[in-house]
Amino acid sequence: MKFTIQRANQSVLELAKSVVDTYRPSYHILPPCGWINDPNGFCFYQGEYHLFCQFNPYSAEWANMHWGHWTSKDLLHWNWHGVALAPDQPYDQSGCFSGHAIADGDVLYLLYTGVKTGEDGLEYQQQCLARSDDGFNFVKSENNPVVPTALQPEGSMA
């Protein structure tokens, strides 16, 4: 299955139609559907707080890790902006895992852990980079992974 941001956001639109809101939290980041974990990438950029987390847009279980994206002006009311990162490249084909965000002037950088499955069946974690000039549309670096598995010390997990 090839993951893309467009495919993930379409899945969210379809699955959200079946979600019952009765017991959903009011003061917590929450996607329209799916699974979230590991809030990360918290930063202040262009007048808003941005928060990202690992997100599965296809089901309410841990799998298919993408990055979900929210913003807030007051840290109380959060707006959902869909998928920021999808595992759509060979170096992150098995998931876009946790990382962080850096606001540097007019650019917002996301550093994340790209996971790929090797020929030996093991999952390898490496550090990857994406950037945005508007805080919402991210482009992955042509130099990814910026810290590949080969450069990591023996026994490290990224």
Place the predicted regions along the sequence by residue.
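Beta-rich carbohydrate-recognition and catalytic domains
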Residues: 1-158
